[in-house]
Amino acid sequence: MKDKIFIFLQYIIPHSLTSRLVSKLAESKNKHLKNYLINLAIKKFKIDISEAKETDINKYTSFNNFFIRELKDGLRPISSDKKIISSPADGVLSEFGDITNGSLVQAKGKTFTLKALIADSSTTDFTKFATIYLSPKDYHRVHMPIDGKLTKMVYIPGKLFSVNKVTAQNVDDLFAKNERLVCYFKTEIGEVAVIFVGALLVAGIETVWHGKVAPNYYKDIQIWNYDNDSFNIEFKKGDTLGWFNFGSTVIILMPNNNISFKYNQSNANISVNQDLALIAE
């Protein structure tokens, strides 16, 4: 019954208004308010502040500034092996595997289509996927899983349903309904996409090359092309791509290149830069 009420509320809550109000609070530079919110989050979500590069909460200019905190150097080591694809984020590896008949697994018994997720029917090379859920306690920066060059970024407007186990099991096409940002990269194994999926209370999605992309008020899909001579935006495995100002989900799409995952089952905890998959010879 509790889950049904929660799902019902997801459909009647004004998603954008609620998220904008939360964003105003999260961006406040009032010292007393931001310190109260930071301390509340640390206590409620059991955030390990000792992992942060800056452990003094007074040094953070806002709650958002705290949520996109950097980690201490060397805390998330990364493999130098070019055959290893690393995790782009801290969180829970909620689902992963093959894209079968154009569909990805959302949760047990539920799938959604690749076409709906990326709003593009022309891309057919993606055959593997991994979905990582970031809870409020997690590190919120997203990193490059493999060496690559940015070729395109697509903002897709949408809803802002909460993203968690309950909504994944009960809201059809959850990740294809929510606001999202799809970043395409040219890599040695082919095209790879890293997708930032928005959610209720997520105060924003930002990238290192563009700045804040969401939330915004576009009603239509927005496309930025970077695959020409005037741009040369390249990333090494482990480089920072961007961040969420609260929490949500990252989906990585990969081509068929004899990729095997290093995990046997879903819902495993995973850390950024940890080995996610292996590229076979």
From Swiss-Prot:
Mind listing the UniProt keywords for this protein, alphabetically?
Answer: Cell membrane, Decarboxylase, Lipid biosynthesis, Lipid metabolism, Lyase, Membrane, Phospholipid biosynthesis, Phospholipid metabolism, Pyruvate, Zymogen
Q: Which organism is it from?
A: Francisella philomiragia subsp. philomiragia (strain ATCC 25017 / CCUG 19701 / FSC 153 / O#319-036)
| Annotated protein name in UniProt | Phosphatidylserine decarboxylase proenzyme
Q: Where is the active site?
A: 90, 143, 248
Q: Which NCBIfam families match?
A: PS_decarb
Taxonomy-wise, where does this protein's organism fall, top ranks first?
Bacteria, Pseudomonadati, Pseudomonadota, Gammaproteobacteria, Thiotrichales
Question: Where is it located?
Answer: Cell membrane
Please give the subunit comment from the record. Heterodimer of a large membrane-associated beta subunit and a small pyruvoyl-containing alpha subunit.
The EC number(s) attached to this protein equal 4.1.1.65
Q: Which reaction does it catalyse?
A: a 1,2-diacyl-sn-glycero-3-phospho-L-serine + H(+) = a 1,2-diacyl-sn-glycero-3-phosphoethanolamine + CO2
The superkingdom of the source organism is: Bacteria
Xref: HAMAP family: PS_decarb_PSD_B_type1
